[in-house]
A protein has these predicted regions:
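A structural signal for short hydrophobic/aromatic patches embedded in well-ordered alpha helices
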Residues: 19-22, 102, 119-120
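ATP/Mg2+ or Mg2+-diphosphate-binding catalytic cores
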Residues: 131-174
Length: 174
């Protein structure tokens, strides 16, 4: 059993080779990672705790620590991972309706290009692997005295497994 030992709990995955699986997934993502998609300044961390709404309307967002010049569609992929799964106890299930609404809203401002749609799956995998790796590292290495809240990385094992089953843009919305 692969274990990631943190200061407060031991994270155990039923996979016997989580680290090996992460390395293999990284190599797969690296090989398929797009070279030329539209780039712009992105937030890079649009999770619900960084987005503010008032009476159902977007108000603003905070925490620009991970802002960078990157693929615009990568921002969308991170939003899918952060906002389009429902949690019931310790299980995360994908919600096509949320993704469809997210993409529809996104496209009222900027239409996705065909090549961005074609790359959405690899971008979602890359985003999920990023959060699995960084949250695992933070969970293990953040001292108890730190001000930040450690976040459980295990949800990203489930999200990454979901993305591995998907092979097209339409699978995300239909």
């Amino acid at each position: 059993v692969a274990s990631l030992v943190g200061s407060e709990m031991c994270i155990r995955d039923s996979s016997k080779n989580l680290v090996s699986e992460m390395k293999n997934t990284f190599m797969e993502i690296k090989q398929g990672w797009p070279k030329t998609l539209p780039k712009n300044i992105i937030h890079g961390d649009l999770f619900i705790d960084n987005i503010f709404f008032h009476r159902g309307k977007f108000l603003g967002f905070i925490d620009f620590y991970f802002s960078s010049n990157d693929f615009e569609a990568y921002e969308l992929a991170t939003c899918i991972n952060a906002l389009c799964f429902n949690k019931k106890k310790k299980t995360f299930s994908y919600d096509k309706g949320k993704t469809l609404q997210l993409i529809k809203g996104y496209e009222t401002i900027r239409k996705l290009q065909k090549k961005e749609k074609d790359c959405l799956n690899i971008l979602c995998k890359g985003s999920a692997l990023r959060y699995l790796a960084t949250r695992s590292y933070d969970y293990i290495n953040t001292p108890k005295s730190a001000i930040i809240k450690k976040k459980d990385p295990r949800e990203y094992i489930q999200k990454l497994a979901f993305h591995k089953k998907i092979n097209s843009f339409s699978s995300y919305i239909k």
